[in-house]
From Swiss-Prot:
Belongs to the shikimate kinase family. Pathway: Metabolic intermediate biosynthesis; chorismate biosynthesis; chorismate from D-erythrose 4-phosphate and phosphoenolpyruvate: step 5/7. It comes from Cereibacter sphaeroides (strain ATCC 17023 / DSM 158 / JCM 6121 / CCUG 31486 / LMG 2827 / NBRC 12203 / NCIMB 8253 / ATH 2.4.1.). It catalyses: shikimate + ATP = 3-phosphoshikimate + ADP + H(+). Monomer. This is Shikimate kinase. Binds 1 Mg(2+) ion per subunit.
Length: 199
């Protein structure tokens, strides 16, 4: 059985030849809420013709409750435990693109699992970009505070040094989702142990 997923992507080579690429490890998108992990990860997966999975959606499916409901009923420690269990299960599967919740990479055990079985890509965004993207969303339980922007700033300050431990980092600022996905694809191309091409 061949390891990885062999795919054909639409290359922009000058000679017009199609580029074959094989994803050999799961790509794990990490970063703050609002960084674009789900949107960019989904676009990346489409471009590589591999499955896209969202760990938060998988947790909600397993619990038959929303993330906000899990936080309210069972608390954050319970959620983090379930998050680690789901992450371990997804990393054991075939190579794919996996989006994780903003706090998933904070747990050392999760970082170790990702390092051993996949490759982490940090979508890096500043406070203004993140706030613009999340301020009108009511689905972020950690931002249900009297001053959500300040809460977001404090989270960013605490988490950025940990996100910096990711294998790769890509700026998530200006540009379309597709352009950001291309930047991630280019970063992955520097890792032949992750993405193999015939170029």
């Amino acid at each position: 059985m061949k390891v990885g997923a062999e795919v054909r992507r639409r290359g922009n080579r000058e000679d017009g030849r199609q580029v074959m690429a094989r994803l050999k490890k799961t790509v794990v998108m990490v970063g703050m809420m609002g960084a674009g992990k789900t949107a960019v990860g989904s676009a990346l997966a489409r471009g590589l013709n591999v499955p896209f999975l969202d760990s938060d959606e998988e947790i909600e499916r397993a619990a038959n409750r929303t993330i906000a409901e899990i936080f309210a009923r069972d608390g954050e420690p319970f959620f983090r435990e379930k998050e680690s269990q789901v992450l371990a299960r997804l990393l054991r599967g075939s190579p794919c693109v996996l989006s994780t919740g903003g706090g998933a990479f904070m747990a050392e055990g999760n970082r170790r699992m990702i390092r051993e079985q996949g490759v982490s890509v940090w979508l890096k965004a500043d406070l203004d970009v993140l706030w613009h993207r999340v301020r009108h969303k009511a689905t972020r339980p950690l931002l249900r505070t009297p001053n959500p922007r300040e809460t977001l700033r404090a989270l960013l300050e605490a988490r950025d040094p940990v996100y910096a431990q990711a294998d790769l980092a890509v700026e998530s600022g200006e540009g379309t989702v597709e352009q950001m996905a291309v930047r991630v694809r280019e970063a992955l191309a520097t890792r032949p142990d992750v993405l193999e091409t015939d170029e």
